[in-house]
């Protein structure tokens, strides 16, 4: 449990993977591409920079606003502007980075006012009651496509990315 509040990304990754393994998603989700096709968003925000997600949203002309203190990139705003901007958010996507740096905790009141909040995995334990209580409506997680645990392990251990590999499918689960 102490690793879940670790400032080190490696320790947080281990702890979140363990928590997710102890409380896995038990329901079938909607494929991410199908879920994104149904988004009707004028104001979409991402808390924490997740490059593949930003690229995917831009490709779909969703034009997200990204709030992140770690990334100095065009189109990325500092997180301190979040409370001023998020009041009119249609969709709020929260990355694991926002969990690790505890930025999500400072946004709890705003999350409860936003009707569509997605917590982005991997490594999110399936605790629907807890997640709903803090204002989360959806959890997006990668799921291994095949029963090839060894292949998945080797791919991730070699530094592979779970975003763009045929071993994974992204699913969105409604709470």
Pin down the residues of each PLM region.
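Electropositive, gly/pro-rich neighborhoods at or near active sites that engage anionic ligands
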Residues: 1-51, 56-58, 154, 170-175
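Structural motif
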Residues: 45, 91-95, 118
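A short acidic, amphipathic alpha-helical/loop segment
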Residues: 56, 103-110, 130
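A short helix->loop->beta-strand "cap" motif at the edges of active sites that frequently abuts
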Residues: 61-62, 111-116, 136
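C-terminal functional extensions of proteins
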Residues: 118-175
């Amino acid at each position: 449990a102490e690793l879940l509040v670790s400032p080190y990304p490696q320790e947080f990754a281990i702890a979140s993977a363990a928590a997710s393994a102890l409380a896995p998603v038990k329901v079938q989700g909607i494929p991410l591409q199908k879920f994104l096709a149904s988004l009707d968003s004028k104001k979409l925000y991402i808390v924490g920079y997740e490059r593949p997600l930003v690229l995917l949203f831009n490709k779909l002309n969703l034009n997200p606003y990204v709030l992140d203190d770690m990334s100095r990139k065009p189109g990325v705003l500092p997180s301190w502007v979040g409370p001023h901007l998020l009041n009119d958010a249609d969709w709020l996507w929260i990355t694991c980075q926002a969990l690790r740096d505890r930025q999500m905790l400072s946004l709890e009141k705003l999350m409860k006012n936003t009707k569509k909040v997605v917590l982005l995995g991997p490594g999110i334990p399936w605790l629907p009651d807890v997640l709903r209580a803090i204002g989360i409506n959806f959890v997006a997680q990668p799921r291994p496509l095949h029963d090839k645990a060894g292949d998945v392990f080797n791919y991730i251990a070699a530094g592979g990315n779970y975003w763009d590999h045929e071993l994974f499918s992204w699913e969105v689960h409604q709470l």
